[in-house]
Amino acid sequence: MALKRINKELTDLGRDPPSSCSAGPVGEDLFHWQATIMGPSDSPYAGGVFFLAIHFPTDYPFKPPKVNFTTRIYHPNINSNGSICLDILRDQWSPALTISKVLLSICSMLTDPNPDDPLVPEIAHVYKTARAQYESTAREWTRKYAI
């Protein structure tokens, strides 16, 4: 079941790739993908290329994939291990969702962080109280790690 669904998503991604994102298997292992997200132009991540690892569980799509950033990023919802705090990767997962939709949600989170459900409270605090400082640090990290 999982393999059939993963293959279908791979075909769909090739046919209709989401803008500014790409994803595909690492080598022959269809359960382990690498994805790239281009930093959205209307965000402090503009110009950056961010890599993510995607691991599909054997009971996919009934359980969500594990997705994490392998490129360092300064963001209130992404920690230093690359873990992502995003509801659709946890309790709001639905088998109707696809990797394409997950990547688009992550892209939108880069533009609009959710400081009220942070994985890194310190960054969320800076985001809420000193937005210019947050954007400056995020741009600096993008230059340092994603370009």
From Swiss-Prot:
It is an enzyme of class 2 (transferase). InterPro entries: UBQ-conjugat_E2_core (IPR000608), UBQ-conjugating_AS (IPR023313), UBQ-conjugating_enzyme/RWD (IPR016135). SUPFAM superfamilies: UBC-like. The active site is at residue 107. The keyword Nucleotide-binding applies. It catalyses: S-ubiquitinyl-[E1 ubiquitin-activating enzyme]-L-cysteine + [E2 ubiquitin-conjugating enzyme]-L-cysteine = [E1 ubiquitin-activating enzyme]-L-cysteine + S-ubiquitinyl-[E2 ubiquitin-conjugating enzyme]-L-cysteine. The keyword Ribonucleoprotein does not apply. Catalyzes the covalent attachment of ubiquitin to other proteins. This is Ubiquitin-conjugating enzyme E2-16 kDa. It comes from Pyricularia oryzae (strain 70-15 / ATCC MYA-4617 / FGSC 8958) (Rice blast fungus).
